[in-house]
Amino acid sequence: MLFVVLQSAATSALALNNCLDNDFADRRGEAVVQIANDDPTNMFRYRPRCVTISEGTLVEFRAVPNFGMHPLFGGTVSGGVATIDPASPIGPFTSGTLGEAMLVAAGEYPYFCDFHFASGMMGSIRVVPELFADGFD
């Protein structure tokens, strides 16, 4: 017998904003997930940078000290060039300290800081279907 393992090209071949498969923190089943640049050793990095969530999760983006210094946009960074996705449900967040996005459709949603993406201040959110209300899928 021959078994073939197929991998999704959307998740394996594309490393949106430098997020590889093993980089994604699994936060499925949580109603609210917070992403912040609050690491005292590296303020130019989001925590978690790459995360998997369930459809319908509210994502809270927190900027330290504020979005005026770290404007956040939905979009990709490739080859050192940031491209804003005007259709992204993320942002833009350019003032204040808290921004929210309700991610209801399965897919991958990359984001970045417009001032510091060259320093690695970017990430991606994978949204997966929640097949059962009890969290088992």
Describe the residue ranges of each PLM region:
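Extracytoplasmic copper-binding redox domains, predominantly the cupredoxin/blue-copper superfamily
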Residues: 14-131
